[in-house]
Amino acid sequence: MRMVLIDGEHYPDVTAWAIKKIGDVSCAVFLGGTEKIGDMKSLEEKIGVKLYYGESYISNIKKAINENKIGEVIDLSDEPVLNYEDRFRIAAVLLKHGIKYKGADFEFSPKEMVQINKPSLTILGTGKRVGKTAISGFVARTLKEISKPIIVTMGRGGPEEPEIIEGNKLEITPDFLVRVAESGKHAASDHFEDALTSRVITIGCRRCGGGMVGFSFFDIVNKGIKLAEKLEGDIVILEGSGATFPAVKADKYITVVGATQRIEFIKSYFGPFRIGLADLIVITLADMVSKEKIEKIQKIIESINPDAEIHLTAFKPRPLSEIKGKKAILVMTAPPEGLEKAARHLENRYDVEIVGKSANLANRPKLIEDLSRFKYYDTVLVELKAAAVDVATKEALKYGKEVIYIDNEPVNIDNKNLREAVLEIGWELKGERK
């Protein structure tokens, strides 16, 4: 059956005429506007279907879809009652419930969400470079304390067929990754990074394209899931890519929000859809913006999803091998301010001398220029992403330099404990309580 969204800017007989033309309409939600209508009771009688109305149109939409079997919602409203932001917010609610949303010249259709036969956790982001892979690695390392997690990724440089990396067994060295790159694969793909930083089994998949809601045009995640179901492991972590995430009906969701993002990408468009899914929300890079912006982001999130637990975090670089006493260059995707903070942290915490820095890990030509300028170093510290292997690692090994990969560890700056929050999710997924 269908539901229609109506307003008081249309005469009731016009609305009734449109409802009749649509057909199979079980109910309507009144969005606002009073210019051309009388009271709600007479409007309901005129349109001939049950009418939901009240102060909050979002609450009324939720109530209507809970009380009726709705497969499609038709928007018969218009400006000034609804603006673009309103419509995106309505779409977010409807798509979360698997309901198509259609207007005069637009249509948002839900993607079929597949089920998985193991407890599952999706980690998605509100954009690229928000630290989603770092959070996934942290979550996997944490869940290892109580379970055997498997990570399924969906990178834009992933393999054509699902690829299993036994991070719990395989020694992932710079030489190994260079050989992978020379074989034609993207050796800095997310499943390699996760395997290196968390030491769990990962399954690399590929995807192409990303829609407005967050689903890919093509991907092979379903094949990866089938492998995960057969492997030893009791929790499957489904890791998104950029603002895209797997079309899987997960048991739990963690949404990663970058504090440096534009506010409208969080509160508008399909930011509310991603936030609305979350059981746990991790705001990353919270040390890179003002207190006022953090407070604004928190208020937006709380207005969209008041039940989600929110954690404010900053990333601290964590070398995966000993670096004490070394003269190193630091290569990252971080912006200049973040790169400087990372360098200071490494020098103060690990007693290493940073003699050169590059923020151009995601820009191959500029990275090559940067590397050609550096002198008097013995070690390259680099994140495993972007051009880390085919440029940074290959160049370092060519000149006899040591390569040490670094992880970005999320650290709470709000006196909360992200590790405990992740463990709580893990216990719930296992059907147990700590």
Swiss-Prot record:
Keyword ATP-binding in annotation: yes
Keywords: ATP-binding, Cytoplasm, Ligase, Nucleotide-binding
Top-level taxonomic group: Archaea
Catalytic class of the enzyme: ligase
Location in the cell: Cytoplasm
GO term, biological process aspect, one: gluconeogenesis
Presence of the UniProt keyword Chloroplast in the record: no
Catalytic activity: (2R)-2,3-bisphosphoglycerate + ATP + H(+) = cyclic (2R)-2,3-bisphosphoglycerate + ADP + phosphate
An example Gene Ontology CC term for this record: cytoplasm
Catalytic activity, EC: 6.5.1.9
InterPro entries linked: cDPG_synthetase-like, Cyc_diphosphoglycerate_synth, P-loop_NTPase
Entry GO MF terms: ATP binding; cyclic 2,3-diphosphoglycerate synthetase activity; ligase activity
Main subcellular location of this protein, as a coarse class: cytoplasm
Family under the similarity heading: Belongs to the cyclic 2,3-diphosphoglycerate synthetase family.
Protein function: Catalyzes the formation of cyclic 2,3-diphosphoglycerate (cDPG) by formation of an intramolecular phosphoanhydride bond at the expense of ATP.
HAMAP family cross-referenced by the UniProt entry: Cyc_PG_syn
Name by which UniProt lists this protein: Cyclic 2,3-diphosphoglycerate synthetase
Organism of derivation: Thermococcus sibiricus (strain DSM 12597 / MM 739)
Designated gene of the protein: cpgS
